[in-house]
Amino acid sequence: MKKFFGILLTLAMVLSLAACGGNDKPADSSTPPADSSQPSADAPSGSASGTFKLGGVGPLTGDAAIYGNAAMNGAKIAVEEINALGGIQFEFQAEDDVADGETSVNAYNTLMDWGMQVLVGPVTTGAAIAVSAEVYNDRVFALTPSASSTDVISGKDNMFQVCFTDPNQGVGSADYISQNMPGAKVGIIYRNDDAYSQGIRDTFVSEAGKVGLEIVSEGTFTKDTQSDFSVQLTDAKSKGADLIFLPTYYQPNAVILNQAKGMGYAPTFFGVDGMDGILAMPGFDTSLAEGVMLLTPFSADAADERTQSFVSKYNELHGETPNQFAADGYDAVYIIYEALQAAGCTG
């Protein structure tokens, strides 16, 4: 399925890259972009050549650094492999946005001054929403590896996503829990000032109502209150929640797992893609992750040759197993490569 989705995405991107000049004016806002789920039979094909400046934006420092570094490291491996093939060549430069919208726009502008032609990123949702408006106005082609809110691409015909979207994560999680853990009493802890967390929570709750999943507790937090979850955990425990759904990033999740253990509370914890990377967090007690479940589009244990080659290279270079953000960064560069080839672009 992921391979098929990749083919559809590449074909949609070919349409966006067909002019290869990036100077088209934005489409009239009253006219929606073409439906990228149905690739055109007339998509251009050809042989691309030349050197393209590929920029990357993501959190290389700060609370979400595990995501950004993994995505950029994965992208770099793909760049090296593609450059070794001859033909299209990529110059790659990554900028740090600390997962902040304003900083991300500044990082994007730095790359534009460098001469960037195609953007890989931003990595996180809030930053990607901020940058997507600039990308659309500048008519720069962009592909985010992992920013999963539909707001990232809504109304923009030159911004794409590798990852699955927040609505799909919320629906998929609720469906899985209802089918595999019937009778579960669910507590939710989410960040209500973050589009990513709020978006997944909303679709999870909506789907839970449709499939008869019982939600007994909900607790919220903000960017400034993610160091103590005792109130949220106490409420969930007192109401009998035996599963805690966490549509949140790895850093608050680590605090939640640690505090739950400290209060003798041991529900099943179920995270989404933001949970990925928690095992690589400095100082994290990995025993706390025993039994934790998460929704992820990538498994480093997959037996196919290409996955194992990527995992081996990543481990050799960085001394750790790649997470889904690394895989998404890697895939993003190959999707761009295939789109450039199909469109016959010249650098």
Predicted features, each with a name:
Residues 1-53, 84-87, 113:
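Short, low-complexity disordered leader/linker segments with a strong preference
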Residues 45, 49-51, 72-92, 209-214:
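Signal peptide-proximal N-terminal region
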Residues 48, 55-76, 95-102, 124, ...:
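Extracytoplasmic "Venus flytrap"
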Residues 56, 111-123, 143-145, 187-190, ...:
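Periplasmic-binding protein-like
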Residues 66-73, 84-153, 221-227, 254:
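Beta-alpha junction/loop-to-helix N-cap segments that form part of ligand/metal-binding clefts
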Residues 104, 162-185, 198, 226-230, ...:
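Hydrophobic alpha-helical segments within soluble ligand-binding/sensing domains
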Residues 159-220, 243:
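An alpha-beta-alpha
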Residues 257-330:
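Extracellular/periplasmic periplasmic-binding protein-like sensory domains
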